[in-house]
C-alpha cells in the first residue's frame, strides 16, 4: 500500500512505467531539480545572461543545469570541491570560482569586467552566502534565494544601495513537474547524477551523515 497525501494536486503520473535507469532523475524532479529550477526562474534567467550560482550541493548543481536549460550563456559555479566542480561543468558551468566571501565577490567581478553577474542563485541559506550573492550581482540584476535561511540578517542600507531584485522562498515544485519530467523522459537532462551514494533504507542515518560530512552530494535510498 502506498499513501500519497493530497494526491489530487501533488501526484503527477508518467506516461507508462519508466525504465529503472531514469528513476533517480525522475526522483530529483520532485525535490532538488524542482528547487534548482525555481532558483533559476526566480532569478529571471534568460538566454544570453551571465549567471552565478552560490552553493555546490544538489540544489546548487541543479541550479546550474536549470540555468543552462534556460539559455544562460555564461554560468559561474562557486565550489571548492573537485567532484562537484566536475559535475557543475557537466551540467553547463563555464567557470568555477573557489573563493568565498569578499574574495569570491571580487573574483566574479573580475570575470565580468567589474560589472557582476546578471543573475545570482543563492542555494545555501547562510549570512555569508547571501551577502556573497548580493555582492556578486550587477546593478539592476536579480538574486534568488532558495537555501533555507540560517541566521540571515540583511543590512537595510547595504541592500538599498545594492539595487538588486530579490525573490525566493520555498519552491513551488508541483508547478514545474510536468516540464521537468518531460525533460527527463526525452533525455534532454540527467539530473539524477547528483545521487552519488546509494544505500539500503535501513542505513538512512549513514546517508544523512555522508551528506552532512560532504562525502556525498545526495543519497539515494532503496528498500
Residues covered by each model-derived region:
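Residues in the short beta-alpha loop(s) of Rossmann-like NAD(P)-binding domains
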Residues: 81, 149, 172
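NAD(P)H dinucleotide-binding glycine-rich loop of Rossmann-like/cofactor-binding domains
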Residues: 1-54
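Rossmann-fold NAD(P)-binding glycine/threonine-rich loop
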Residues: 147-163
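C-terminal hydrophobic helical "lid"/dimerization subdomain
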Residues: 131-135, 174-223
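Hydrophobic/small residue at the entry helix of a nucleotide-binding pocket
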Residues: 35, 59, 67
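Adenosine-nucleotide cofactor-binding segment
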Residues: 53-56, 68-132
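A generic alpha-to-beta junction signature in SAM-dependent methyltransferases
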Residues: 43-45, 112, 124, 136-138
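Glycine-centered, small-residue-biased loops immediately flanking beta-strands
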Residues: 49, 141-142
Amino acid at each position: 500500500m502506498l499513501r500519497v497525501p493530497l494526491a489530487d494536486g501533488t501526484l503527477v503520473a508518467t506516461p507508462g512505467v519508466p525504465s529503472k535507469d531514469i528513476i533517480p532523475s525522475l526522483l530529483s524532479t520532485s525535490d532538488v531539480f524542482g528547487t534548482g529550477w525555481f532558483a533559476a526562474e526566480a532569478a529571471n534567467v534568460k538566454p544570453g545572461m551571465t549567471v552565478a550560482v552560490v552553493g555546490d550541493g544538489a540544489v546548487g548543481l541543479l541550479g546550474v543545469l536549470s540555468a543552462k536549460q534556460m539559455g544562460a550563456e555564461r554560468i559561474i559555479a562557486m565550489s571548492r570541491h573537485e567532484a562537484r566542480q566536475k559535475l557543475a561543468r557537466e551540467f553547463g558551468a563555464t567557470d568555477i570560482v573557489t573563493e568565498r566571501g569578499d574574495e569570491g565577490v571580487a573574483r566574479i567581478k573580475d570575470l565580468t569586467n567589474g560589472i557582476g553577474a546578471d543573475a545570482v542563485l543563492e542555494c545555501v541559506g547562510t549570512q555569508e552566502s547571501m551577502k556573497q550573492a548580493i555582492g556578486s550581482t550587477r546593478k539592476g540584476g536579480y538574486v534568488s534565494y532558495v537555501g533555507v535561511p540560517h541566521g540571515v540578517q540583511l543590512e537595510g542600507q547595504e541592500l538599498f544601495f545594492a539595487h538588486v531584485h530579490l525573490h525566493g522562498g520555498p519552491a513551488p515544485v508541483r508547478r514545474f513537474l510536468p516540464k521537468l519530467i518531460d525533460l527527463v523522459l526525452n533525455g534532454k537532462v540527467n539530473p539524477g547524477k547528483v545521487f552519488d551514494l546509494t544505500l539500503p533504507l535501513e542505513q538512512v542515518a549513514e546517508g544523512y551523515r555522508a551528506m552532512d560530512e560532504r562525502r556525498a552530494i545526495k543519497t539515494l535510498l532503496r528498500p
